[in-house]
């Protein structure tokens, strides 16, 4: 049983800028797992932080929780042009993940936002909400991953056809995302390599999602492409960030070398992502039971 005092202590860790970023991330994911209005309130309070990486992750977690009570704060973040593009983008995606049609018109409004990552995200969220309306809600068949995705996986099963759809930049972004998630769900080396080819496509939003799904797959075949994207200083920081976190999740020795090489990167979101990814690497290669260990750390402060 989790006490209110414990939830508050985890929340205090999240909102305390004096805490190491890794500890704040673990607190965030602990709150996400706990759920409920108190957890949402603590997560919402951290949107005035100066770390774009942390704020982006706050929005991501609120979307994954799929709790309507998070809609007002996510709308505020989407509307706030002082927030970094990657934060506003994640708020738009989170609104799509929650799946409530009440936000459809607002998402349509921001589908023409001057920030292209925000506009494309809201276009995808609109398509997702429309798809949910047409198909009577979420699919009853769950894939191998627990995440709430910006698009449902395509029904096509042929990897060659899916690769072709993924890389065809003339197709609607929503359809390419559907191919992306179908390849992820298929798993294996061929699917991972097909996805890794997407890191060369034109849309930064698309490339960043490729990095995300490769991190979910944790297939080492994609390590060279992820490391190359991370090492490219002209690549969009949002893409480099996802590639860093993917390398942390894959957790092979080559990943460790790539992350250490960029832990002092001049781009803040990249170096912070490498810090968090190194913490994830430690978790993946260690004996810790779970990453979201905020409660365990409270109960065993010496560990």
Curated annotation (Swiss-Prot):
Q: What is its EC number?
A: 1.14.99.29
Report the pathway entry: Protein modification; eIF5A hypusination
Annotated SMART domains: EZ_HEAT
Its required cofactor(s), as named, are: Fe(2+)
Residues of the signal peptide: none
Residues holding Fe cation 2: 89-90, 208
Q: What class of enzyme is it?
A: oxidoreductase
What ranges cover the HEAT-like PBS-type repeats?
Answer: 23-49, 54-80, 87-113, 175-201, 206-232, 239-265
Provide the binding site for Fe cation 1.
56, 241-242
Pfam families, from UniProt? HEAT_2 (PF13646)
Q: Which reaction does it catalyse?
A: [eIF5A protein]-deoxyhypusine + AH2 + O2 = [eIF5A protein]-hypusine + A + H2O
Q: Which family does it belong to?
A: Belongs to the deoxyhypusine hydroxylase family.
Q: What role does it play?
A: Catalyzes the hydroxylation of the N(6)-(4-aminobutyl)-L-lysine intermediate produced by deoxyhypusine synthase/DHPS on a critical lysine of the eukaryotic translation initiation factor 5A/eIF-5A. This is the second step of the post-translational modification of that lysine into an unusual amino acid residue named hypusine. Hypusination is unique to mature eIF-5A factor and is essential for its function.
Q: What's the protein called, per UniProt?
A: Deoxyhypusine hydroxylase
């Amino acid at each position: 049983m989790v006490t209110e005092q414990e939830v508050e202590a985890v929340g205090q860790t999240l909102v305390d800028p004096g805490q190491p970023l890794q500890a704040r991330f673990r607190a965030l994911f602990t709150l996400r797992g706990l759920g409920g209005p108190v957890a949402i309130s603590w997560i919402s309070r951290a949107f005035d932080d100066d770390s774009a990486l942390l704020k982006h992750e706050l929005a991501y977690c609120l979307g994954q929780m799929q709790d309507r009570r998070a809609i007002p704060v996510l709308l505020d973040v989407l509307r706030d042009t002082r927030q970094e593009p990657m934060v506003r983008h994640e708020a738009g995606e989170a609104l799509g993940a929650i799946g409530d049609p009440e936000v459809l018109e607002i998402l349509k409004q921001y589908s023409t936002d001057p920030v292209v990552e925000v506009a494309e995200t809201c276009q995808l969220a609109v398509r997702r909400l429309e798809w949910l309306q047409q198909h009577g809600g979420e699919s009853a068949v769950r894939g191998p991953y627990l995440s709430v995705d910006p698009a449902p996986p395509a029904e096509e099963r042929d990897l060659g056809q899916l690769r072709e759809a993924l890389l065809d930049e003339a197709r609607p972004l929503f359809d390419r995302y559907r191919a992306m998630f179908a390849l992820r769900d298929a798993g294996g080396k061929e699917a991972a390599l097909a996805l890794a080819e997407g890191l060369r496509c034109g849309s930064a939003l698309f490339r960043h999602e490729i990095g995300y799904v490769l991190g979910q797959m944790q297939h080492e075949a994609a390590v060279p492409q992820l490391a190359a994207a991370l090492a490219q200083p002209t690549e969009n920081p949002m893409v480099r960030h996802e590639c860093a976190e993917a390398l942390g999740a894959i957790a092979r020795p080559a990943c460790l070398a790539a992350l250490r090489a960029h832990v002092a990167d001049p781009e803040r979101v990249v170096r912070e992502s490498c810090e968090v990814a190194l913490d994830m690497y430690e978790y993946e290669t260690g004996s810790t039971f779970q990453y979201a260990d905020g409660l365990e750390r409270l109960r065993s402060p010496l560990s």
